[in-house]
Regions:
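Intrinsically disordered, low-complexity regulatory segments
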Residues: 1-157, 163-166, 171, 186-187
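Extended, Lys/Arg-enriched charged tracts that mediate electrostatic binding to polyanionic substrates
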Residues: 176-188
């Protein structure tokens, strides 16, 4: 009887929903997992999962320069794993880096998870050092996605694509094959 009781308690503990923390780097995920313990699952996105396709412009110029995003080739498995974990979780904590790229990564992942499991709360957390105190403080004070940072990253990405896709072919034709043009590659 005592053994059955222990097994039941163990099963109840294992069935408790955990909080999913998503970071960009697998090394960070491993370290953070040690600090947060058994109530959390920490996964890595391995950086961007969503971007513009490489094979075409993918900027809808007639619709306010709206980008046409896709899941990056080879990243669907990671995205599906994150969505699967999110469905089983109590909440999702998006902990990508605190910069434009990180905010964009968090925004894209949040949208994909929200589409797959709308009932799971999704929060954005930010920390600037990987310590137990910094992580706990970030978890206690979640914030919304900074849409201004997301829009800044989107604008940069759209400009890069427009400049590169339109000017690079001209360079190949007029100067030399293999040259490329970009927002930060050319003299201002």
């Amino acid at each position: 009887m005592e053994t059955n009781l222990k097994i039941e308690k163990k099963e109840k503990n294992n069935s408790k929903k955990k909080k999913l923390v998503i970071v960009e780097s697998p090394a960070k995920a491993k370290t953070i997992n040690r600090y947060l313990g058994a109530d959390y699952i920490v996964k890595s996105s391995m950086g961007h999962l969503i971007d513009l396709p490489r094979s075409r412009m993918a900027i809808d110029i007639d619709n306010g320069f709206e980008p046409e995003y896709i899941t990056i080739r080879g990243r669907a498995k990671i995205l599906n794993e994150l969505k699967k974990e999110a469905k089983k979780s109590e909440e999702v904590l998006l902990a990508a880096d605190d910069d434009r790229e990180g905010e964009s990564i968090a925004w894209h992942i949040g949208n994909k998870i929200r589409g797959a499991s709308s009932s799971v709360p999704i929060k954005r957390i930010v920390f600037h050092e990987i310590t137990k105190d910094a992580l706990n403080e970030a978890i206690e004070k979640p914030r919304d996605i900074d849409i201004a940072k997301v829009n800044a990253q989107k604008a940069r990405r759209v400009l890069d694509r427009l400049i590169g896709y339109n000017l690079s072919p001209l360079l190949w034709e007029k100067i030399k094959r293999g040259l490329s043009a970009g927002r930060v590659q050319n003299v201002a």
